[in-house]
Amino acid sequence: MSEKQVKYPWWYGGAAGIFAVMNTHPLDLTKVRLQAAPIPKPTIVQMLRSILKNEGIVGLYAGLSASLLRQCTYTTARFGMYDALKEHVIPRDKLTNMWYLLGASMVSGALGGLAGNFADLINIRMQNDSALPLDKRRNYKNAIDGMVKIYKAEGAKSLFLTGWKPNMVRGVLMTASQVVTYDMFKNFLVTKYNMDPKKNSTHLTSSLLAGFVATTVCSPADVIKTIVMNAHKKPGHNHDSSFKILMEAINKEGPSFMFRGWVPSFTRLAPFTMLIFFAMEQLKKYRVGMPKEEA
């Protein structure tokens, strides 16, 4: 399609992510709380009621600054790299080929996961902090305060590398299942059902389907990442490995633990995916931030 030949600004993904997360942060917070909750796990409704009762409306936005920082790093990196690879690496006649797109998305997701790992660490800890006993709370005031406190208490390695392996895996899975499936579903709807590629109905349908796929594919890595990053660490000690956490969880809960919190994950990721791609399409449509000659 002709729009793929246009060079869009690298920051479109991050800007769209900020728009999406501003509208879905309470759902993300609920998902994190449920993934970190002990057995027996509450339902999504019970968790929401508990947050509202104990923390009020403000509690639903705990860790928002870290979520925004995450969009500026993780989302900007993975979307920017994905578009760059499509523009400079993938042959023009292969832009709808699933295998080429998967390769580009995996590289982009891995780099995005690594780039945004520190922000994700702060985000998860801030979102789950109020659910911890008073003596275990970290009490980060905001994302910057969280960075400083982690650096002082645990060191730079902990700040940038805690949970990086499951986070990179999740980044690969998320980008492949979210971005590629969006492109594939959109192309399918346009070519098979003659839907208008510029209409919002096409964008929203494609993104809803992509959100379902992404939630299911990413759930195992997402759960492990949340557990690893939320764990307390003493100076001089390493976190348990992701593999050890995986084995312990399987022994305790069975394989179903990998889909713990699937419903709140989908409840959050479906609207997030719809909003981020809707925002991306609007940015592209109006050529925001582009020179007039390109618009």
Swiss-Prot record:
Keyword line: Antiport, Membrane, Mitochondrion, Mitochondrion inner membrane, Phosphate transport, Repeat, Transmembrane, Transmembrane helix, Transport
Pfam families hit by this protein: Mito_carr
Transmembrane segments: 8-24, 63-82, 98-122, 163-182, 204-224, 262-280
GO molecular function, one term: dicarboxylic acid transmembrane transporter activity
Cellular component GO terms, alphabetical: mitochondrial inner membrane
Solcar repeats by residue range: 4-88, 96-188, 198-286
Main location: mitochondrion
Family: Belongs to the mitochondrial carrier (TC 2.A.29) family.
Protein function: Mitochondrial dicarboxylic transporter catalyzing the exchange of dicarboxylic acids like malate and succinate for inorganic phosphate. Required for growth on ethanol and acetate.
Subunit structure: Homodimer.
Record's protein name: Mitochondrial dicarboxylate transporter
Organism from which the protein derives: Candida glabrata (strain ATCC 2001 / BCRC 20586 / JCM 3761 / NBRC 0622 / NRRL Y-65 / CBS 138) (Yeast)
